[in-house]
Amino acid sequence: MTALAAGIAMLAGLGVGIGIGIATGKASESIGRQPEAFGRIFPLFLIGAALAEAVAIYSLVIAFMLISKI
């Protein structure tokens, strides 16, 4: 049962992957349309990607905690 709970906790990784993929596509599209805006777009993209990855890391930690039954 704990393996199922850990698997459900890791579903957040699916959402993170989709979200970062969409954000990367939109950032690339924006930079392609306005290359001079690279300095404004890229840092915001990195901050957003880092925040999204934090969710994935938290869900991984929760999954490990569930498996080890802490």
UniProtKB/Swiss-Prot annotation:
**Chief localization:** membrane
One GO cellular-component annotation of the UniProt record comes to: plasma membrane
GO MF annotations for this entry? lipid binding; proton-transporting ATP synthase activity, rotational mechanism
Give the way it sits in the membrane.
Multi-pass membrane protein
Question: Where are the residues marked Reversibly protonated during proton transport as a site?
Answer: E53
Where in the cell?
Answer: Cell membrane
| Keyword entries, A-Z | ATP synthesis, Cell membrane, CF(0), Hydrogen ion transport, Ion transport, Lipid-binding, Membrane, Transmembrane, Transmembrane helix, Transport
Report TM segments.
3-23, 44-64
Superkingdom, taxonomy of origin: Bacteria
Query: What is its quaternary makeup?
Result: F-type ATPases have 2 components, F(1) - the catalytic core - and F(0) - the membrane proton channel. F(1) has five subunits: alpha(3), beta(3), gamma(1), delta(1), epsilon(1). F(0) has three main subunits: a(1), b(2) and c(10-14). The alpha and beta chains form an alternating ring which encloses part of the gamma chain. F(1) is attached to F(0) by a central stalk formed by the gamma and epsilon chains, while a peripheral stalk is formed by the delta and b chains.
UniProt lists the family membership as follows: Belongs to the ATPase C chain family.
Record's function text:
F(1)F(0) ATP synthase produces ATP from ADP in the presence of a proton or sodium gradient. F-type ATPases consist of two structural domains, F(1) containing the extramembraneous catalytic core and F(0) containing the membrane proton channel, linked together by a central stalk and a peripheral stalk. During catalysis, ATP synthesis in the catalytic domain of F(1) is coupled via a rotary mechanism of the central stalk subunits to proton translocation.
Protein name (Swiss-Prot/TrEMBL): ATP synthase subunit c
Q: Which organism is it from?
A: Caldicellulosiruptor bescii (strain ATCC BAA-1888 / DSM 6725 / KCTC 15123 / Z-1320)
